[in-house]
Amino acid sequence: MEQSSFIKINPADSVVVCLRPMKKGETIEVDGKTITLLQDTPAGHKVLINDVAEGTDILKYGYPIGHAKTDLKAGEWVNENNLKTNLAGTLEYTYNPVDEQLNIAKENRTFKGYVRKNGEVGVRNEVWVVPTVGCVNGVAEKLVELLKKETGCEGIDAIHAWHHNFGCSQLSGDHENTRKVLRDICLHPNAGAVLVLSLGCENNQPDDFMKMLGDYDHDRIKLLVTQKVEGDELEEGMKILRNLYAQAKEDKREDVPVSKLRVGLKCGGSDGFSGITANPLVGEFSDWLVAQGGTSILTEVPEMFGAETILMNRCENKELFDKTVHLINDFKEYFLSHGEPVGENPSPGNKAGGISTLEDKALGCTQKCGRAPVSGVLQYGDRLETTGLNLLSAPGNDLVAATALASSGCQLVLFTTGRGTPFGTFVPTMKISTNSNLAKNKPNWIDFNAGALVEGVEMKDLVSKFIDKIIAVASGEEARNEYNGYREISIFKNGVTL
């Protein structure tokens, strides 16, 4: 059997990953040993290469992904039926810093972006309607419909309302999270102009909310409180939107250094190829971007469980290490406070694709942030302050996490997927497939195919093409989610609803 039928990711691994469906009785040559497969094993799934006793750790990516539930023989298909997570509660961690040099040259690349008055740069120039409360979602959608009909979006990239269910009937942390995310959307550089649309009586009081925006551009961000309008709020809203649209229409793209790019890193519908193709590809891009002076952000904190020490030891200093420890343990406490196990993460789709435990998922997931040092740690709803690689507190849920990334200031999100997903958040959400079958079957969803990495294409060649693609999207080329009109936001909720 040819070597290309499987891959051993790390020399220390006790499993190999099948690159194609393999049949019971087939043989593979691994480290000078002939191993006979004991079961039919799907592509992306793991085959044990040594006999192990019950309780023995199984290694992949060079780290434990769980332990054997029973004695296992070489050639066995390793999956959730015979592999158990090692994850439990919160842990105490020790800072053992790792200083790894990237040694990536600066290339002085540029993209065509929109430079805002405050110096931030957008990759889109859109007019947005942001409801302060879900009660006015319908009004917001109607205003967008009217403005689109009247203008045809001529001279700008899009007109959109970001509807949500919150802004009232919330308390403490949930209420503050909603306000922070809505604030972040209003201040996002991809918006050329924003109408903040309020009902008037909601918990998220309009005057207080506008104060949260700080020193904002009063010409480009306007407030309309619908309960204060005598008569037709649509007529009043259109007056404001016409003015905002006229201003945004004057904005033009200009050459901007790639150091101004801020990119979110996300995965969803992951499979056994995620940690082999798409995530390492995104990791290579992330390192390249950081070396250019740009910024990348990794979130999905629960999907760091099992790989967290790798990130902790890459923190630039002890203060960042301590923040990362809190990031991890706070999310574990969140799980435990709801009576949920911290390791119960892989979805049915993950398992069908070859991911058996949360450690298995996490070690693949964190490939997306490459090898760069961690230079910043953000709480949910915080806006970026530091260039380089940042970690952001948010759950693994695709819509919530992608919204959180965009809210922090990312102009676009890189989203790797092995199973496929059409959704997008309020910034361009590029889908990178882990396998070529997905790219072939869902070209309307997928922006870039990383599956070529197991088909003979060299990483350096694919990274070069990937960089070109990202710069093209940053310069105005539509991501597939934009072309399809699949754009939405989702805000994290933890507490009661009144």
Segments predicted by a language model, with ranges:
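Metallocofactor- and cofactor-centric catalytic cores in central/energy metabolism, strongly enriched
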Residues: 2-412, 419-422, 427-498
